[in-house]
């Protein structure tokens, strides 16, 4: 059986050009006015507590 050929490993990681790695998705933040209105319809006290917590 022939000897195994050992090739030197590159020190820097192999990357494709233009590939900067993972990034956060561009997702718009929810509209807080509509959120508070929906919460008021469901549970007015919970909406009031949320408003106090979030500083609204």
Swiss-Prot record:
Gene Ontology MF term list: protein tag activity
InterPro entries noted in UniProt: UBact (IPR037543)
Record key words, sorted: Isopeptide bond, Ubl conjugation pathway
Compositionally biased residues, Basic and acidic residues: 30-46
Record location of the Isoglutamyl lysine isopeptide (Glu-Lys) (interchain with K-? in acceptor proteins) cross-link: 56
Chain intervals for the UniProt region annotation (Disordered): 1-56
Transmembrane segments: none
Pfam families, per database record: UBact
HAMAP family listed in its UniProt record: UBact (MF_02133)
Family: Belongs to the ubiquitin-like protein UBact family.
Function: May function as a protein modifier covalently attached to lysine residues of substrate proteins. This may serve to target the modified proteins for degradation by proteasomes.
Protein name from the UniProt record: Prokaryotic ubiquitin-like protein UBact
Annotated organism of origin: Acetithermum autotrophicum
């Amino acid at each position: 059986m022939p000897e195994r050929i050992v090739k030197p490993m590159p020190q820097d990681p192999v990357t494709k050009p233009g590939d900067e790695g993972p990034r956060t998705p561009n997702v718009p933040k929810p509209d807080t006015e509509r959120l508070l209105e929906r919460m008021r319809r469901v549970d007015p006290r919970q909406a009031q507590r949320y408003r106090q917590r979030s500083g609204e």
